[in-house]
Amino acid sequence: MKLAIVAGDGIGPEVVAQAVKVLDVVQPGVEKTNYDLGARRFHATGEILPDSVIAELREHDAILLGAIGDPSVPSGVLERGLLLRLRFELDHHINLRPGRLYPGVKSPLALEPGNPEIDFVVVREGTEGPYTGNGGAIRVGTANEVATEVSVNTAFGVRRVVRDAFERAMRRRKHLTLVHKNNVLTFAGSLWWRTVQEIGEEYPDVELAYQHVDAATIHMVTDPGRFDVIVTDNLFGDIITDLAAAVCGGIGLAASGNIDATRTNPSMFEPVHGSAPDIAGQGIADPTAAIMSVSLLLAHLGLDDAASRVDRAVEGYLATRGNERLATAAVGERIAAAL
């Protein structure tokens, strides 16, 4: 395996170091290349993501990312110039966000004993919607300012994400929920609903449901156990996945995959928490989400046994840690030792 590592900013290098520690135990011999991308490079050279680096990244099997963002860089510069550009250049059309409440982890929800287990996955479209940069503004700063952000939804883009979601549902509990707002967003909503129904005919064993996005947020709080696989567009997915993380114990336990399902380009795996510059360098950041991202990476590459071993080690750690607060390195060492 050839792995590109982008540790990034803030706590990124700290949590990635522990993720790599676990990877080395479960999958020895990985060929790793570190890439200096983020605020430090931006300040030193003015570069964000050179074309030459993108070309090099394409030669790898996967990318492991830490975190991007620093208060010394204007908001949006690194996010659009690095994160979003990687997603578009490498065609990461699927953003995969598992949501599971692990034994030993407390949810902010007042869950009743006997409630269904919280274990779902969100398949979010990653390269379309309102994040394509299709918009503009005129008369900026005046009382007559007009601003637009156009949501782009293509049949090709929707179909490939929906099909991936059905495939995942077949490997899970065979239930898929489309989340959208087709009573108001009638054009895009119609495309999504018709596509789900059409492709759903190829998967008769998968039970299909639909929820407006506002209803989905309610049910994710009141009855999250009803969900198995959720498929949704870029914007709605961006919102409900963070709610899902909170329901499952916090964003510090949320892993993600930015995936090119065609495998033409390397997919990228990362914890979804930010760079947390306020605690960077203190050795107190929780690397669990970064380690869980390694599990997603291994599973994507077909190394299912190694991925399962990481999952079990993380589950065992979370089940026994209680209220103990461990240093970053100690968490990595404990999970690695469990392997």
Curated annotation (Swiss-Prot):
Pfam families: Iso_dh (PF00180)
Catalytic activity annotation: (2R,3S)-3-isopropylmalate + NAD(+) = 4-methyl-2-oxopentanoate + CO2 + NADH
InterPro entries, per the entry: ICDH/IPMDH (IPR050501), IsoCit/isopropylmalate_DH_CS (IPR019818), IsoPropMal-DH-like_dom (IPR024084), LeuB_actb (IPR023698)
Pathway in which this enzyme or protein is active: Amino-acid biosynthesis; L-leucine biosynthesis; L-leucine from 3-methyl-2-oxobutanoate: step 3/4
GO biological process, one term: L-leucine biosynthetic process
Record's GO cellular component terms: cytoplasm
Record bears the keyword Manganese: yes
Free-text comment on the cofactor: Binds 1 Mg(2+) or Mn(2+) ion per subunit.
Cofactor(s) for this UniProt protein: Mg(2+); Mn(2+)
Site annotation Important for catalysis: residues: Y131, K181
Metal-binding in keyword set: yes
Binding positions for Mg(2+) per the UniProt entry: D214, D238, D242
EC number per UniProt: 1.1.1.85
Positions contributing to substrate binding: R87, R97, R124, D214
Gene3D superfamilies: Isopropylmalate Dehydrogenase
Record keywords, A-Z: Amino-acid biosynthesis, Branched-chain amino acid biosynthesis, Cytoplasm, Leucine biosynthesis, Magnesium, Manganese, Metal-binding, NAD, Oxidoreductase
Binding site for NAD(+): G274, S275, A276, P277, D278, I279, A280, G281, Q282, G283, I284, A285, D286
EC class: oxidoreductase
Location(s), subcellular: Cytoplasm
GO molecular function annotations of the record: 3-isopropylmalate dehydrogenase activity; magnesium ion binding; NAD binding
Family of this protein: Belongs to the isocitrate and isopropylmalate dehydrogenases family. LeuB type 2 subfamily.
Quaternary organization: Homodimer.
Role description: Catalyzes the oxidation of 3-carboxy-2-hydroxy-4-methylpentanoate (3-isopropylmalate) to 3-carboxy-4-methyl-2-oxopentanoate. The product decarboxylates to 4-methyl-2 oxopentanoate.
PANTHER family on file: D-MALATE DEHYDROGENASE [DECARBOXYLATING] (PTHR43275:SF1)
UniProt protein name: 3-isopropylmalate dehydrogenase
Source organism per UniProt: Mycobacterium marinum (strain ATCC BAA-535 / M)
Taxonomic lineage of the native organism: Bacteria, Bacillati, Actinomycetota, Actinomycetes, Mycobacteriales
